[in-house]
Amino acid sequence: MDVHLQQRALPVRRGTARLTPRGRRGHPVLPGGLGRSTFAVGADSPVVVRGEGPRVWDADGNELIDLNANFTTLVHGHAHPLIVRAAQRATADGASFGMPSRPEMLHAEVLLDRLPDYDQVRYSNSGSEAVATALRVARAATGRDKAIFVRRAYHGTSDHALATGGEGARRGVSRAVLDETLVLALNDIDALVRAVAEHDGKIAAIVLDRLPNRAGLLPLRVDYARRARELCDRHGIVLVGDEVVTFRLAHGGIAGEDGVRPDLLTLGKLIGGGHPVGAVVGGADLMAEFDPRRGGALEHGGTFNGNPVSMEAGRVALDLLDPVAIERLDGLGDRARARLAAEAGDAWEVRGRGSLLRLFPVAGDAAAWQLDLWWAAYARGVLLMQTALAALPTVLSDGDLERCVDAIAEAAREVAARRAADGDGSG
Ligand SMILES: Cc1ncc(COP(=O)(O)O)c(C=O)c1O
């Protein structure tokens, strides 16, 4: 065998010895032991070692049904054979290149087939990059700086996107960015009209997610979305629809529902089939901002933009998420929400749409209740998001769904009883 292809033992790393028994806790070579602030669940966060289909296994050997799905990304579960094969083939043919490659073009064709109102797409490596890039297009096209967001709606980790969060999220964001970011309450039409009037001629973009999770997983009202569209038309503002999460809910996403067509869409997560991806989609007019043949085009690169592995895996993921798959997920979601509403107890409210659902305490410290629920569901073999959001994958069997609902309902009742005993919320 070619010496370069021989398997060699990996060098033992200095830090390995410092892993806690069975690797159960985070590693001290990572700040806080973790790689993302969204992983934080308290001091003793379990570590995952493997995923297959709708399941993951942790370092203690626990098996869980994964409704976290890497924060809604893995709409077909882990290691779907067709997606794995596509990624393997793409890797074998060269994982990334310094020139255009066909997988990017094929992915764009498949994506735009689902979005007939749009002409072109520019890829990046995350939803955060996609939102930041869409904002830059809006600023370049309008010659203005300000952008309107919904309070607490999450749009990633760019400075502008973090400005929508609370004090903690805004730490480290420059005063200049905070000043250009107008953050308004969800569905407050009067506030939107006032902000546009007050900052007339200075607003480049309104950024909307039709079902913003961190803002409470409550839908943007149709009249709000339509008014935003009207204001954009009247005042020359670019409407950006963030579909990084919601694209899983309908074949062409939900940003354009009710006759509201955003000028730009931002995508990510599922469209990479579990590999890093982000995308800005738009009409030819705005997307011309990226065209390097045009004078004054935007500078936009990215070493891994449109890399063949994400593109090929993502194309298969998109193909598999056809209307039939989405309809089945809608049915599973409706069943889960109905059962949880009936069985989780009066202390909880169940919200969501399609394959997304989330539990909220009717009173008390929501984040604390939801984190407790994360642990209580974990103990019963179900992995939620730390905000108690669940994303159902297409590979979930009907039996698995019922098991998940049993576990979450029982966990919810346990948390409510404990919190009531501690005097937090209505219990
Ligand atoms: C609505 C929305 N937009 C943007 C992002 C950022 O995507 P990424 O984490 O890929 O940067 C997220 C991430 O969860 C999101 O939920």
Label for each model-derived stretch:
Residues 3-427:
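Conserved N-terminal phosphate-binding loop of PLP-dependent enzymes in the Aspartate aminotransferase
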